[in-house]
């Protein structure tokens, strides 16, 4: 039976429609690939409650993790107005109130839908450690006040506590190595562990304590100085030790107290203050710290006059008297005060007051040790009036830079046992990779290991060329079907 031309056209159009539709279906099902949509972003809020001030940091990371640890970056840094929270002993509620301005700035940055699942934490360091020793109930009242403020915020409050010195040192080490790409780096479109990354040591000088943390060449013989943790699927063993009362503010307080006790008069000649400097202070304010030994016969109502003489040699001698070096005499694995320390090894980043002091003295460009020493001595020998005229608007810390600079040299060279050969291994930095160096980022990296990860959402998708081909065959199928319908319609009318 011979088909009419209408029947032949109708059959051809049906065949084209079937072939085009089948081809389109094959392209969709066979050529499709699984595409991972970008992960949602999570946020975390951390308060660093130091001895002299408090800072807030907001960190962010993808909701999915790399080897059980979040890939964290800094989104905000905010310095809280006022002193450190340990200063609010007479009115603890003000410690909590002081945090509100920075907290509001953080909440404005974080999407409102994320507020209830954003962890917030306050870690207090050496200033509160000292207050806890002096008056534990006052320390608890302050922690309760800041906890009350943060628990009322629309965030997931994880608590406020005093960090151990060892934790502060270890988290600082994590921060330095993370921002330098020693723990994880981005390569060929993915995050990978560095094959042979040289780990960097961390040197932290706060107001009340100082920390040294590094991975030594050999084993750590004193287990009390060893911290182990797991990040991005790798295990780390780090030497770390914190020296309470050896922070910048407390060492200068101790130094002045020693000068007062040795002079036995109400007028003290201070070798670390510039010649021509003079100030009056109360003895009560000097001895208001657990770091300072209080004499039995102290007249708290007496005032003290301090005169600067600008003698860096005598200043160094006085600073050395605050260390117990004899307890480590002849021992290579001992720092000072009888504390075990393996020989320093590798590169180090020095931050906090290490950086602030050397930045003021213009010594952060890795100058040789002899240049550093010469620069500090010459600065110490400048008369006070010349120093004031040379640095307007910096009166708050100006008198202390001489003592701080010389103290850093004594601490690093005679305390931590750096030498002229290893001095070039120290970099004085505030930031690395646009991120502030301190314990907070290391803490957040560790914290993300406790926050559940979210799986990436998968979608079936095609490449652009396959998508275009699919559209062409879809249009061809539609045209063939419409053509067949038209032929059928005209055929029926005939």
UniProtKB/Swiss-Prot annotation:
InterPro entries: GDA1_CD39_NTPase
Intrachain disulfide bonds: 78-102, 245-291, 328-334, 380-402
Tissues expressing this chain: Present in liver, and at lower level in jejunum and kidney. Limited to the canalicular domain of hepatocytes (at protein level).
Extracellular topology ranges: 30-465
GO biological process: nucleoside diphosphate biosynthetic process; nucleoside diphosphate catabolic process; nucleoside monophosphate biosynthetic process
Cofactor note: Ca(2+) or Mg(2+). Has lower efficiency with Mg(2+).
EC number per UniProt: 3.6.1.5
UniProt KW keywords: ATP-binding, Calcium, Cell membrane, Disulfide bond, Glycoprotein, Hydrolase, Magnesium, Membrane, Metal-binding, Nucleotide-binding, Transmembrane, Transmembrane helix
Topological relation to the membrane, as annotated: Multi-pass membrane protein
Function: Canalicular ectonucleoside NTPDase responsible for the main hepatic NTPDase activity. Ectonucleoside NTPDases catalyze the hydrolysis of gamma- and beta-phosphate residues of nucleotides, playing a central role in concentration of extracellular nucleotides. Has activity toward ATP, ADP, UTP and UDP, but not toward AMP.
Protein's name in the database: Ectonucleoside triphosphate diphosphohydrolase 8
């Amino acid at each position: 039976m011979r088909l009419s031309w209408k029947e032949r056209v109708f059959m051809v159009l049906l065949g084209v429609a079937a072939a085009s539709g089948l081809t389109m279906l094959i392209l969709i099902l066979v050529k499709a690939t699984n595409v991972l949509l970008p992960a949602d972003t999570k946020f975390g809020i951390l308060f660093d409650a130091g001895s002299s001030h408090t800072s807030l940091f907001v960190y962010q990371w993808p909701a999915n993790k790399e080897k059980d640890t979040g890939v964290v970056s800094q989104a905000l840094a905010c310095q809280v107005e006022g002193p450190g929270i340990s200063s609010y002993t007479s009115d603890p509620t003000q410690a909590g109130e002081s945090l509100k301005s920075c907290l509001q700035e953080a909440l404005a940055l974080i999407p409102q839908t994320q507020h209830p699942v954003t962890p917030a934490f306050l870690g207090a360091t050496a200033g509160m450690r000292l207050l806890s020793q002096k008056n534990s109930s006052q320390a608890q009242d302050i922690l309760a006040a800041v906890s009350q403020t943060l628990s009322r915020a629309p965030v997931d409050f994880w608590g406020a506590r005093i960090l151990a010195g060892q934790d502060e040192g270890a988290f600082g080490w994590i921060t330095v190595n993370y921002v330098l790409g020693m723990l994880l780096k981005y390569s060929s479109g993915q995050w990978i562990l560095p094959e042979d990354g040289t780990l960097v040591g961390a040197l932290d000088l706060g107001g009340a304590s100082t920390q040294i943390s590094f991975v030594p060449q050999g084993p750590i013989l004193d287990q009390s100085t060893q911290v182990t943790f797991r990040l991005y699927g790798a295990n780390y063993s780090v030497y770390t030790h914190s020296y309470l009362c050896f922070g910048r503010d407390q060492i200068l307080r101790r130094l002045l107290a020693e000068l007062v006790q040795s002079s036995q008069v109400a007028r003290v000649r201070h070798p670390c203050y510039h010649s021509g400097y003079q100030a009056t202070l109360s003895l009560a304010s000097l001895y208001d710290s657990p770091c300072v030994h209080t004499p039995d016969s102290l007249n708290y109502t007496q005032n003290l006059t301090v005169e600067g003489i600008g003698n860096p040699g005598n200043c160094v001698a006085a600073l050395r008297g605050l260390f117990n070096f004899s307890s480590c005499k002849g021992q290579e694995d001992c720092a000072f005060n009888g504390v075990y320390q393996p020989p320093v090894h590798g590169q180090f980043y020095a931050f906090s007051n290490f950086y602030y002091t050397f930045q003021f003295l213009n010594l952060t460009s890795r100058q040789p040790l002899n240049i550093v020493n010469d620069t500090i001595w010459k600065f110490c020998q400048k008369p006070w009036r010349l120093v004031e005229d040379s640095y307007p608007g910096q009166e708050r810390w100006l008198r202390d830079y001489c003592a701080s600079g010389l103290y850093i040299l004594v601490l690093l060279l005679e305390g931590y046992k750096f030498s002229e050969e290893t001095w070039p291994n120290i970099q004085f930095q505030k930031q690395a990779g646009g991120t502030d160096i301190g314990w907070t980022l290391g803490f957040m990296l560790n914290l993300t290991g406790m926050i559940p990860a979210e799986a990436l959402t998968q979608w079936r998708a095609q490449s652009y060329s396959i998508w275009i081909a699919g559209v062409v065959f879809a249009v061809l199928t539609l045209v063939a079907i419409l053509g067949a319908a038209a032929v059928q319609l005209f055929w029926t009318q005939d």
